[in-house]
Regions:
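Hydrophobic core of transmembrane alpha-helices in multi-pass small-molecule transporters
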Residues: 104-120, 232, 313-327
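Extracytoplasmic gate region of multi-pass secondary transporters
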Residues: 33-37, 219-274
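Residue-level signature of mid-helix packing/kink "hotspots" within the transmembrane helices
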Residues: 31, 59-67, 153-154, 267-275, ...
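C-terminal ends and interior cores of transmembrane alpha-helices
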Residues: 87-100, 296-309
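Helix-to-loop junctions at the C-terminal end of transmembrane segments
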Residues: 65-77, 274-285, 372
Length: 413
């Protein structure tokens, strides 16, 4: 028998709305980071590799912190983790605003924002959805939470662009910092602590299964390992494009506004793609859905870099890559929950997300490094294409079924 689900006095509708607002608020400033690259390096005389390395640290530490934040949320509830994460995130934006040296930039934009995101991003929201919502709500809620983060990417870059042009990049970062603090009151709706697996079509629950047992079980499961490996590409592509696309378009002779609106278009298209992915996750094979997403990204990137850049091609690329942007999240999170249940979902999805963020670290860092070496981004664009094709193949052998647990498995002492 599965343990009873988390009890909440908050209706599912309110849980979803508050969780989606948290995802929107926390994803927006992070998705706008590319807008600050040229103003900051111009003012301080840094290279693009300096800014890129700071965001690379952010991606890596977001990934490093995610499993631990997920484990704490699984044990004690999401509210405290979300509040601490929001405080670190806001502090990181403030430090970034006043960073006059590469070291301070790396601390603010890298360390503080990275760990802050691990504690308050949409990944924690999805884990809370898995525990607090009835089973029938979950796939669409995963899509809605991901789409809300995507809408943050649509909403914040144009706002950031206007703030930078009107008040300067430092003031824009301070406004973003204030907005992140809104996460704290919204997190009250996700404050319930779950006591075990919620009823679902998944593996038989193991009473008092320890974190160590859960991790050992997961990393011995071939399908989970393949899922984790495939997610690396998602992070590589997304982080590289988020940070370096505005500069790539500026190098092509386009205005900064085109870069901002292209990022915004990605966010808006992603909202549609994430909702569609959540819906499709309930109606088709999740591994095939992931394979088609990764293949589609490679096709979109290939077309974009082979066609001369213009405002029209930039927006069209934003639409095509945006539909596929975070559409990997609903099938990935659903597969983790299908394989292992809800009890340690936030932690196990966190380890998958760590792979995602290692990819993000390399995508951002290599983007800046290879630009300084070669004077262009061509090598990283082509690497993104190859990785997309590889991940499409990696996901195909995944078995969409719960992990087999021996009835005689004993609980932890």
């Amino acid at each position: 028998m599965s343990a009873s689900p988390a009890r909440s006095r908050v209706s599912p509708e309110i849980i979803v709305v508050c969780g989606c607002l948290i995802a929107l608020i926390t994803f927006g400033p992070r998705a706008s980071s590319g807008l600050f690259q040229l103003p900051m390096i111009t003012e301080y005389g840094w290279g693009r590799d300096t800014f890129g390395f700071a965001i690379a640290i952010q991606n890596l530490l977001w990934g490093v912190g995610q499993p631990f934040a997920g484990a704490v949320a699984d044990r004690f509830g999401a509210f405290r983790v979300l509040c601490v994460g929001a405080l670190l995130y806001a502090l990181g934006l403030v430090v970034m605003a006043y960073a006059t040296t590469p070291g301070l930039l790396h601390v603010g934009a890298g360390v503080l924002i990275g760990f802050g995101l691990s504690g308050c991003s949409f990944n924690l929201v999805l884990g809370a959805f898995g525990k607090l919502l009835p089973e029938k709500w979950r796939p669409m809620a995963f899509g809605a939470g991901t789409a809300a983060g995507s809408f943050g990417q649509f909403l914040f870059p144009p706002i950031g662009n206007v703030l930078i042009e009107s008040f300067g990049w430092q003031q824009a970062l301070l406004v973003f910092a204030a907005s992140v603090l809104l996460v704290m009151p919204l997190a009250l709706a996700l404050a319930t602590r779950a006591t075990g697996d919620s009823p679902q079509a998944g593996p038989a629950a193991v009473p008092n299964q320890s974190i160590r047992q859960a991790l050992a079980e997961a990393f011995k499961h071939r399908s989970y390992v393949l899922l984790v490996l495939g997610f690396f590409t998602c992070g590589f592509q997304l982080a590289f494009i988020t940070v370096h696309l505005p500069a790539y378009l500026k190098d092509a002779g386009l205005s900064a506004a085109v870069g901002g609106w292209t990022l915004a278009t990605i966010g808006l298209a992603n909202a549609v793609g994430s909702l569609a992915s959540g819906w499709l996750s309930t109606r088709m094979s999740k591994r095939w859905l992931l394979a088609w997403i990764y293949l589609g990204r490679s096709v979109a990137i290939t077309a974009f870099i082979l066609i001369p850049a213009s405002p029209v091609t930039s927006i069209l690329f934003g639409i095509s890559i945006g539909v596929l942007w975070l559409s990997t999240v609903p099938p990935t999170s659903s597969l983790v929950m299908l394989m292992f249940g809800t009890r340690y979902m936030a932690m196990l999805y966190g380890f998958a997300f760590f792979s995602h963020q290692v990819g993000g670290f390399l995508g951002v860092w290599l983007g800046g490094l290879l630009y300084e070496i070669n004077g262009n981004y061509s090598a990283v664009w082509w690497l993104s294409i190859v990785l997309g094709l590889a991940s499409a193949l990696i996901n195909l052998p995944i078995k969409e079924q719960p992990v087999v647990r021996e009835p005689a498995l004993q609980p932890a002492e």
